[in-house]
């Protein structure tokens, strides 16, 4: 099972924004509280962040689909929805982010470096945010928009100062194990090293990193062997060390022919343009500082071979070191030579002026409308496609099940000038209008409808509870009316009291009692009998 992966295709998508809320405020003694629908929360972002604890892209090889959380919907009482949580994906130092077509999007170098791979969608506005003097009680809200979604390629390019290059079984892994604390897999068969190994070397006051790159063969620049899979790990290195096998038993190989083949492959390999220097030029691999390490001189034949080829290599301008990973012969001298090259490269970088990307301000043109209309033909019928950030975003925010929301969209498009531009382009009633690309919304254009006002049974943005409220009594008027009612009740009670004292009600009651006949009791009638 693979434990090291340096190239993956990652499918990322930001969270969808929450929908706005349609709500009317309800509170005691406030029957006309007005709209109080809150805004939806924004969707979460997907961020790539450099983490030194991460050394491989293996996790994304097994789980390539990553999605941030969505934003929460808005609620009543002006409560906004919860924003979606940001999804942070740790990547190794030296990860290059590319698009599907190979365009470099970001080069992540340094602890904590971040890149937003997919931004979350914004949340929709609630009806409280949409209210105005003309639209006092909106009966609709805006929908949240989906987050960005893209397929990106992650490539890991090792961060090292020196790269060890050479044929398989030349002893590169043995050298890095002898010079540092790295413990790569070492065996006596070709292509034992299948992943780059990094080791830290201390030479005097200079501390640097060396990379053990898997063996290269003829045609590696064209993809043969491990080819491009590991040549890219050499691109960041300031210098190269050719590790030549002086103890090879193959009859058709020798250090000089091995060096010629490796140099040819390095010359053919095209370095990524993202590694250009301060002058904007890329330094080819075969033009960088190079050292030659004649390895395995501890063998009798190896020592003789090293002494035989050394004059020829020095005549070509190489600094040659006879080393042995087994006996550690010559490793100290090789380490200090590497440190000298690394220090010179670092000093050159510090002395170079900082590369500053100028900020270009491009003001919007006076006649810029924020949209454009493209005329197309579909089934021999004209089709007008409206493109632009604003109209496309407005369509995504519209709830087409709500007539008032559709009318609001029509108003916005009319104010933007879409209808006027359609007239200029020769659009006729009944023509098809599409807002957006292939996934856009299709309309049958009817210019006689004034911004969709006829779609509503009542004026848009109004509430019958708020209509004709100009004659509503004020609080002082209400208190006066209440006092008048109290005074009227007190006057009525006083009048009744005056009538009672005058005996009007008493005489009438006494008269009715006198007019009633007196009934004899049963006892009296019994006695008479």
UniProtKB/Swiss-Prot annotation:
<feature type="compositionally biased region" description="Basic and acidic residues">
    <location>
        <begin position="462"/>
        <end position="502"/>
    </location>
</feature>
<comment type="similarity">
    <text>Belongs to the TRAFAC class OBG-HflX-like GTPase superfamily. OBG GTPase family.</text>
</comment>
<keyword id="KW-0479">Metal-binding</keyword>
<dbReference type="InterPro" id="IPR015349">
    <property type="entry name" value="OCT_dom"/>
</dbReference>
<dbReference type="GO" id="GO:0003924">
    <property type="term" value="F:GTPase activity"/>
</dbReference>
<keyword id="KW-0547">Nucleotide-binding</keyword>
<keyword id="KW-0460">Magnesium</keyword>
<feature type="domain" description="OBG-type G">
    <location>
        <begin position="160"/>
        <end position="343"/>
    </location>
</feature>
<dbReference type="InterPro" id="IPR006169">
    <property type="entry name" value="GTP1_OBG_dom"/>
</dbReference>
<feature type="binding site">
    <location>
        <begin position="191"/>
        <end position="195"/>
    </location>
    <ligand>
        <name>GTP</name>
    </ligand>
</feature>
<dbReference type="GO" id="GO:0000287">
    <property type="term" value="F:magnesium ion binding"/>
</dbReference>
<dbReference type="InterPro" id="IPR045086">
    <property type="entry name" value="OBG_GTPase"/>
</dbReference>
<dbReference type="InterPro" id="IPR036726">
    <property type="entry name" value="GTP1_OBG_dom_sf"/>
</dbReference>
<feature type="domain" description="Obg">
    <location>
        <begin position="2"/>
        <end position="159"/>
    </location>
</feature>
<dbReference type="InterPro" id="IPR006073">
    <property type="entry name" value="GTP-bd"/>
</dbReference>
<dbReference type="InterPro" id="IPR027417">
    <property type="entry name" value="P-loop_NTPase"/>
</dbReference>
<comment type="function">
    <text>An essential GTPase which binds GTP, GDP and possibly (p)ppGpp with moderate affinity, with high nucleotide exchange rates and a fairly low GTP hydrolysis rate. Plays a role in control of the cell cycle, stress response, ribosome biogenesis and in those bacteria that undergo differentiation, in morphogenesis control.</text>
</comment>
<dbReference type="Pfam" id="PF01018">
    <property type="entry name" value="GTP1_OBG"/>
</dbReference>
<dbReference type="Pfam" id="PF01926">
    <property type="entry name" value="MMR_HSR1"/>
</dbReference>
<dbReference type="Pfam" id="PF09269">
    <property type="entry name" value="DUF1967"/>
</dbReference>
<dbReference type="InterPro" id="IPR031167">
    <property type="entry name" value="G_OBG"/>
</dbReference>
<feature type="region of interest" description="Disordered">
    <location>
        <begin position="461"/>
        <end position="529"/>
    </location>
</feature>
<dbReference type="GO" id="GO:0042254">
    <property type="term" value="P:ribosome biogenesis"/>
</dbReference>
<dbReference type="InterPro" id="IPR014100">
    <property type="entry name" value="GTP-bd_Obg/CgtA"/>
</dbReference>
<keyword id="KW-0378">Hydrolase</keyword>
<feature type="binding site">
    <location>
        <begin position="166"/>
        <end position="173"/>
    </location>
    <ligand>
        <name>GTP</name>
    </ligand>
</feature>
<feature type="domain" description="OCT">
    <location>
        <begin position="363"/>
        <end position="447"/>
    </location>
</feature>
<keyword id="KW-0342">GTP-binding</keyword>
<dbReference type="InterPro" id="IPR036346">
    <property type="entry name" value="GTP-bd_prot_GTP1/OBG_C_sf"/>
</dbReference>
<feature type="binding site">
    <location>
        <position position="173"/>
    </location>
    <ligand>
        <name>Mg(2+)</name>
    </ligand>
</feature>
<feature type="binding site">
    <location>
        <position position="193"/>
    </location>
    <ligand>
        <name>Mg(2+)</name>
    </ligand>
</feature>
<feature type="binding site">
    <location>
        <begin position="295"/>
        <end position="298"/>
    </location>
    <ligand>
        <name>GTP</name>
    </ligand>
</feature>
<feature type="binding site">
    <location>
        <begin position="212"/>
        <end position="215"/>
    </location>
    <ligand>
        <name>GTP</name>
    </ligand>
</feature>
<protein>
    <recommendedName>
        <fullName>GTPase Obg</fullName>
        <ecNumber>3.6.5.-</ecNumber>
    </recommendedName>
</protein>
<keyword id="KW-0963">Cytoplasm</keyword>
<comment type="subunit">
    <text>Monomer.</text>
</comment>
<dbReference type="InterPro" id="IPR006074">
    <property type="entry name" value="GTP1-OBG_CS"/>
</dbReference>
<dbReference type="GO" id="GO:0005525">
    <property type="term" value="F:GTP binding"/>
</dbReference>
<feature type="binding site">
    <location>
        <begin position="324"/>
        <end position="326"/>
    </location>
    <ligand>
        <name>GTP</name>
    </ligand>
</feature>
<dbReference type="GO" id="GO:0005737">
    <property type="term" value="C:cytoplasm"/>
</dbReference>
């Amino acid at each position: 099972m693979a434990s090291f992966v340096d190239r993956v295709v990652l499918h990322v998508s930001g969270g969808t924004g929450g929908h706005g809320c349609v709500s009317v405020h309800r509170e005691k003694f406030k029957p006309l509280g007005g709209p109080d629908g809150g805004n939806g929360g924004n969707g979460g972002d997907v961020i790539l962040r450099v983490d030194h604890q991460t050394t491989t892209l293996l996790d994304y090889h097994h789980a390539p689909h990553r999605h941030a959380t969505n934003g929460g919907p808005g609620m009543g009482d002006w409560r906004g929805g919860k924003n979606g949580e940001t999804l942070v994906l740790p990547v190794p130092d030296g990860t290059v982010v590319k698009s599907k077509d190979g365009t470099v999007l970001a080069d992540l170098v340094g602890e904590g470096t971040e890149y937003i791979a997919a931004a979350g969608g914004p949340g929709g506005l609630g009806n409280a945010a949409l209210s105005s003097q003309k639209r006092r009680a909106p009966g609709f809200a805006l929908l949240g928009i989906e987050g960005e979604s893209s397929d990106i390629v992650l490539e890991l390019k090792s961060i090292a100062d020196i790269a060890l290059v050479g044929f398989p079984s030349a002893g590169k892994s043995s050298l890095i194990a002898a010079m540092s604390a790295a413990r790569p897999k070492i065996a006596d068969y070709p292509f034992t090293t299948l992943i780059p190994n990094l080791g830290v070397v201390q030479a005097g006051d200079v501390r640097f990193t060396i990379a053990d790159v898997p063996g290269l063969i003829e045609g590696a620049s064209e993809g043969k062997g491990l080819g491009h899979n590991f040549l890219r790990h050499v691109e960041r290195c300031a210098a190269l060390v050719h590790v030549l096998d002086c103890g090879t038993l193959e009859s058709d190989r020798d250090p000089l022919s091995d060096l010629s083949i490796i140099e040819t492959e390095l010359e053919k390999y095209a370095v990524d343009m993202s590694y250009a220097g301060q002058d904007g030029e890329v330094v080819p691999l075969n033009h960088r500082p190079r050292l030659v390490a004649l390895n395995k001189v501890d063998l009798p034949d190896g020592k003789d071979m090293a002494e035989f080829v050394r004059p020829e290599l020095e005549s070509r301008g190489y600094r040659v070191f006879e080393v042995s990973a087994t006996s550690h012969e010559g490793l100290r001298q090789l380490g200090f030579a590497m440190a000298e090259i690394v220090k010179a490269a670092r000093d050159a970088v510090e002395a170079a002026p900082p590369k500053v990307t100028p900020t270009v301000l491009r003001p919007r043109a006076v006649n810029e409308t924020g949209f454009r209309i493209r005329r197309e033909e579909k089934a021999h019928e004209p089709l007008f496609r409206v493109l632009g950030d604003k109209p496309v975003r407005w369509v995504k925010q519209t709830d087409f099940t709500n007539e008032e929301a559709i009318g609001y969209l029509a108003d916005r498009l009319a104010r933007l000038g879409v209808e006027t531009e359609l007239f200029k382009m020769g659009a006729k009633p009944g023509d098809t209008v599409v807002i957006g690309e292939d996934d856009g919304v299709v309309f049958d254009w009817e210019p006689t409808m004034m911004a969709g006002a006829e779609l509503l049974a009542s004026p848009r943005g109004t509430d019958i509870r708020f209509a004709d409220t100009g004659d509503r009594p004020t609080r002082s008027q209400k208190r006066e009316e209440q006092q008048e009612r109290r005074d009227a009740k007190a006057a009525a009670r006083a009048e009744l009291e005056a009538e009672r004292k005058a005996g009007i009600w008493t005489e009438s009651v006494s008269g009715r009692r006198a007019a009633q006949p007196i009934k004899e009791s049963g006892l009296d009638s019994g006695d008479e009998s």
